[in-house]
């Protein structure tokens, strides 16, 4: 059984997959990337900040956004968060 969730044309994009560990009480200032980003939380809880909005995601949650929009990351807990991150990097000239 398949349930349609997301479709994105990938022509000329580079796929990068990472496992990311965000240590307790960590804050990363906003930055932007030249990629579409898909994040799935394996363990822990983190907050992604976008302009005036903050999104909290925990185990089993998935977040997809355009990394061109500046975004911050915060782990305000005492536990390390573990994320599965997929980057679709745009071509550069």
Question: Which sequence ranges carry the predicted segments?
Answer:
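A short glycine-rich, His/Asp/Glu-containing loop-to-beta-strand
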Residues: 1-30, 36, 86-87, 91
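Conserved A-loop
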Residues: 21, 45, 70
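Ligand-binding loop in jelly-roll beta-barrel domains
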Residues: 58, 67-93
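Short hydrophobic/aromatic patches on the structural cores and recognition surfaces of FHA
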Residues: 6, 44-46, 60-62
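Glycine- and acidic-residue-biased ligand/ion/polar-headgroup-sensing regions
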Residues: 34-51
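Short beta-strand His + acidic residue motifs that chelate non-heme Fe in jelly-roll/DSBH
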Residues: 30, 48-49, 55, 71-77
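Short acidic-glycine-tyrosine-enriched beta hairpin
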Residues: 51-67
